């Protein structure tokens, strides 16, 4: 089985068509519109708005929900910093909820504990491709009247109790960054069934042009109107988050092949999981029976220091020596990053962040697990290459079994 991680479908053909077209911009081309149409259909949504990154989609989603200065946004303590930066770009206050120690996803009970009268939105991240506990989360959302943003940057086609991830929150955000299931180098998209949210997000992504609508990123006006010196264009403060037509063409071709991409990542993850089945110090992310995992990466909690007396770093070094290509440590919990500890971000709205503390111990489960996580790749180009890495892991496990 070959891995369609980069391209092996219509990408090249679509790029040729873009190069032969008159416009490479979303404002007048057709590829961004087609990508939005097909993505909305695939993920059972009324509206889709494509943008140039997953961070842009998160920021636009928060603004569409009305998040602004002094509001609080709850997000998980174990994830990349982009949920935090999107919150800060909305001039809001990041609030962190701890995680479940087995699934590594946000803990609904801690979400509820962190809600205040300032909470304006909740971001939930389907970490590594595993859906969050959406029934509990949406019950909390309805109880308190707080909208939910699904950050599905790492999660494509996973299901939770039979429902497709991306169809349960108020807005869903996706990423087309280089390592994701769908990749066009950089890119992202939001989906929603709410026309108001889609229209605001569209305007935020398109310089705030007043004629942009939920279902189109193009402005169709008579030349005599928009060329008139008295014509007023902008109803919102917006950014240029538009995706280029070449990038949209690549992403569309990738979308057409998404089932195969997810299938292969699952197959590779299964190979690793079988190898560690009886290993008591390599504990994989727990996937509940009512969910499936699209395995953006395979997350494993390492307890070898306690069980073997072998550090995370030494285990990784041995794995590499046997032919493994290394595995990644999990990102530092966002609030312990230097930018948060030195509070450099507060210069934007200093009064808003007075008295806000992000000290160590804020989310103890996430802090404890983060340093133990191993993130094994699942986007190898072929099963044969993946088998070599699985064999390297087997040799590493066997080595420490013999020396134990």
What feature does the model see in each segment?
Residues 23, 155-161, 168-297, 332-335:
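Active-site region of PLP-dependent enzymes
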Residues 25-72, 83-89, 95-98, 163:
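Phosphate-binding glycine-rich loop
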Residues 63-152, 159:
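PLP-dependent aminotransferase-like
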């Amino acid at each position: 089985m070959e891995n369609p991680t980069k391209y092996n479908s219509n990408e090249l053909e679509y790029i040729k068509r873009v190069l032969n077209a008159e416009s490479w911009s979303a404002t007048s081309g057709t590829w961004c519109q087609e990508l939005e149409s097909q993505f909305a259909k695939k993920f059972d949504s009324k509206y889709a708005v494509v943008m140039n990154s997953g961070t842009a989609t998160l920021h636009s989603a928060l603004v569409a929900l009305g998040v602004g200065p002094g509001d609080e946004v709850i997000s998980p303590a174990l994830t990349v910093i982009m949920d935090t930066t999107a919150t800060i770009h909305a001039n809001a206050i990041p609030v962190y909820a701890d995680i479940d120690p087995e699934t590594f996803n946000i803990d609904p009970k801690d979400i509820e504990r962190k809600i205040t009268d300032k909470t304006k939105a909740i971001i939930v991240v389907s970490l590594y491709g595993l859906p969050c506990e959406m029934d509990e989360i949406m019950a909390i959302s309805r109880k308190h009247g707080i909208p939910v943003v699904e950050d599905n940057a790492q999660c494509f086609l996973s299901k939770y109790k039979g429902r497709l991830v991306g169809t349960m929150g108020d807005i869903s955000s996706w990423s087309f960054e280089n390592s994701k299931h769908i990749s066009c180098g950089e890119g992202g998209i939001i989906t929603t069934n709410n026309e108001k949210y889609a229209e605001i997000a569209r305007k935020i992504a398109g310089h705030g042009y007043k004629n942009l609508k939920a279902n189109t990123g193009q402005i169709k006006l008579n030349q005599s109107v928009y060329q008139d010196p008295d014509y007023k264009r902008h109803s919102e403060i917006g950014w240029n988050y538009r995706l280029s037509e070449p990038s949209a063409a690549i992403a569309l071709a990738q979308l057409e092949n998404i089932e195969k991409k997810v299938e292969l990542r699952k197959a590779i993850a299964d190979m690793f999981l079988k190898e560690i089945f009886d290993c008591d110090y390599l504990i994989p992310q727990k996937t509940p029976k009512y969910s499936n995992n699209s395995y953006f990466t395979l997350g494993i909690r390492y307890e070898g220091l306690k069980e073997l007396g072998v550090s995370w770093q030494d285990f990784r070094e041995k794995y590499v020596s046997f032919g493994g290509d290394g595995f990644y440590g999990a990102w530092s919990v966002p609030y312990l990053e230097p930018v948060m500890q030195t509070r450099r971000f507060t210069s934007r709205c200093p009064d808003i962040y007075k008295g806000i503390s992000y000290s160590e111990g804020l989310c103890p489960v996430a802090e404890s697990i983060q340093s133990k996580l191993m993130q094994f790749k699942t986007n190898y180009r072929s099963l044969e290459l993946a088998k070599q890495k699985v064999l390297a892991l087997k040799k590493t496990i066997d080595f420490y079994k013999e020396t134990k």
